């Protein structure tokens, strides 16, 4: 699976389970001093209602020092911030880390390269967590 230009979503493979990928991401976030605002367990919530869903978790994270200038320049960018990483398992039991591409966020909100660099941590996190 690769980046889909029409959706702006980048899919990066992980060589770990969903749970291990999430734990790895949490450790990396903590080491980098990036705040984890929340972790949403979509599959866990589905199970509570009697529905089956492959493992799917969403991390919402950020650094107000990096995100605030972006939102000041483009208030509507707050709909995409804090940053998000979706960790999910496909039908073949392959695990993926998905996130909005920086180019998509830049085009969507008219952000300069300088402001986009504030959000580049999302790419680093996905790369580090998948290996």
Task: Go through each PLM region and give its residues.
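Beta-strand/loop substructures that line and gate deep hydrophobic ligand-binding cavities in soluble
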Residues: 84-109
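Well-ordered alpha/beta subsegment
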Residues: 107-131
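Short beta-strand element of the conserved SAM-dependent methyltransferase core
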Residues: 11-12, 59-62, 87
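Short Gly/charged-rich anion-binding patches and loops
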Residues: 23-24, 41, 73, 121
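Terminal, regulation- and interaction-focused segments at domain boundaries
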Residues: 2-33
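Compact, glycine-rich, soluble single-domain proteins
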Residues: 37-83
